[in-house]
From Swiss-Prot:
UniProt DNA-binding region: 21-40
Family: Belongs to the LysR transcriptional regulatory family.
CDD domains given in the database record: PBP2_IciA_ArgP
Assembly behavior: Homodimer.
Keywords, ordered alphabetically: DNA-binding, Transcription, Transcription regulation
Protein name per the record: HTH-type transcriptional regulator ArgP
PROSITE patterns: HTH_LYSR
Transcription as UniProt keyword: yes
Domain HTH lysR-type intervals: 4-60
Any GO molecular function: DNA binding
Native organism: Photobacterium profundum (strain SS9)
PANTHER family: HTH-TYPE TRANSCRIPTIONAL REGULATOR ARGP, TRANSCRIPTIONAL REGULATOR
Database matches in InterPro entries: ArgP (IPR017685), ArgP_gammaproteobact (IPR023490), LTTR (IPR050176), LysR_subst-bd (IPR005119), Tscrpt_reg_HTH_LysR (IPR000847), WH-like_DNA-bd_sf (IPR036388), WH_DNA-bd_sf (IPR036390)
Length: 298
């Protein structure tokens, strides 16, 4: 990056990654004062603030763009230099991806497994709601993101992966207690459901679309674990919207029942990644796309 001292941007990156100046200084093996000075020099060069100094610190819009560029350069550097100096393979290639919890719980790890076993890669998986994974790609925190959004980010491409078919399921006992006469507006209001976090609107969309219930009218537990959704449903704690590929065994055994067999939610998945890729990143995208298209309904 012309005119930019890498050490200055590294300081900004460390403050964001370590969530503060003190830990950033420890990471870089310099003083907090030196970290602060480097960021000030960078801001002076760019003629604008790059860091919002709150707790934890966060980058400004310009800071995000600069960090995105810096992280791309660093990743390419990590990938290319070992090819030039093959004896220097002491550092793994650091690859950060953003994924939704349902993909992680079903097909993503088997898709990446061969690459992780054959390459010297340090994987960092950031798990977010399906609607928020692209934010990580926009900010430059990750090199790729699995999302339900089809819109392409500038400088990136979006490849279709397949469908996630979400079924509304519960244990037989739960069905008997709350839905013995079928699922209706009246019994949905009293039956507990589950959402991943406060950004997860899938549950609300389902009851609004099919049962005309207004947002906020149903009870929902909040659990940030896709695997826990299955356990909560089989334990009879709540009814859940879960991908069919994740619970086929439980359905076959009768541990779970599809309480709305005529109704489901279908969500398309896309792999968003840099348009300019090479080496390991190209291989990663190819493996991920190929596996997903075999594992997911098309």
């Amino acid at each position: 990056m012309r005119g930019v001292d890498y050490r200055w941007v590294a300081a900004l990156d460390a403050v964001i990654a370590q969530r503060g100046f003190e830990r950033a200084a420890e990471k870089l093996c310099i003083t907090q004062s030196a970290v602060s000075q480097r960021i000030k020099q960078l801001e002076k060069l760019m003629a604008q603030p790059l860091l919002v100094r709150e707790q934890p610190p966060r980058p400004t819009a310009a800071g995000q763009k600069l960090l995105g560029l810096y992280r791309r350069v660093r990743l390419l550097e990590q990938e290319v230099l070992p090819e030039i100096t093959p004896d220097d393979i002491s550092q793994p290639l650091s690859v950060a991806l953003a994924t939704n919890a349902d993909s992680l719980a079903t097909w993503l790890l088997p898709a990446l497994s061969p690459l992780l076993k054959s390459r010297f890669i340090e994987l960092n998986l950031l798990v977010e709601d399906e609607a928020r994974t692209l934010d990580k790609l926009r900010s430059g925190e990750v090199v790729g993101a699995i999302s339900m959004e089809a819109g392409v980010i500038p400088g990136c491409v979006a490849d279709y992966l397949g469908r996630m078919n979400y079924l509304c399921v519960a244990s037989p006992d739960f069905q008997q207690k709350y839905f013995s006469n079928g699922v209706t507006q009246a019994n949905l209001v009293s039956a507990p459901g589950v959402v991943f976090d406060h950004h997860d609107d899938m549950h609300e969309v389902f009851v609004q679309q099919y049962f005309n219930l207004p947002i906020g009218s149903v009870m929902k537990h909040t659990v940030r674990s896709s695997e826990a959704f299955v356990r909560i449903a089989t334990e009879g704690i709540a009814y859940c919207l879960i991908p069919e590929v994740q619970i086929q065994r439980e359905l076959d055994r009768g541990d779970l029942v599809n309480v709305t067999p005529e109704l489901s939610l279908v969500r398309n998945l896309y792999w968003h990644h840099w348009a300019l890729e090479s080496g390991v990143l190209t291989e990663l995208s190819e493996r991920l796309i190929q596996y997903a298209r075999q594992a997911l309904p098309q």
